[in-house]
Amino acid sequence: MLGLHVGTLISLFLCILLEPVEGSLMQPCQPINQTVSLEKEGCPTCLVIQTPICSGHCVTKEPVFKSPFSTVYQHVCTYRDVRYETIRLPDCPPWVDPHVTYPVALSCDCSLCNMDTSDCTIESLQPDFCITQRVLTDGDMW
């Protein structure tokens, strides 16, 4: 009985001790400026811009004992409030609409991943990945 009590106290002490370390190493879920690429099928260039996206740590719990009858929901850092902006891609042929709309994060939240607004994959392409030739927003080529 005493061993169980001491083990509980040690666990509690470690949680209190490590809490500031964990908090300082992991950024909270919040909007951050990120370089992203905008491209469209049929247009020869990829426009690289800076825009706020949601990024950061969300507390999640993985159950020790997994049951086939229970569902585990993992929370991710995703958009709470979002505004959409439209930009014109350069050098698109006349038959391709050169406009691309992208989300701008106004605020973020730890919640279930919404496939309509977020990339919920484990390993995805970087946000500034381009298939076509890259162009910076100030006109410089990469």
Swiss-Prot record:
GO molecular function per UniProt: hormone activity
Primary location class: secreted
Official protein name in the record: Gonadotropin subunit beta-2
InterPro entries per the UniProt record, alphabetical: Cystine-knot_cytokine, Glyco_hormone_CN, Gonadotropin_bsu, Gonadotropin_bsu_CS
Family according to the record: Belongs to the glycoprotein hormones subunit beta family.
Disulfide bonds: C29-C77, C43-C92, C46-C130, C54-C108, C58-C110, C113-C120
Keyword Transcription carried by entry: no
Protein's cellular compartments: Secreted
Protein species of origin: Oncorhynchus keta
Protein role: Involved in gametogenesis and steroidogenesis.
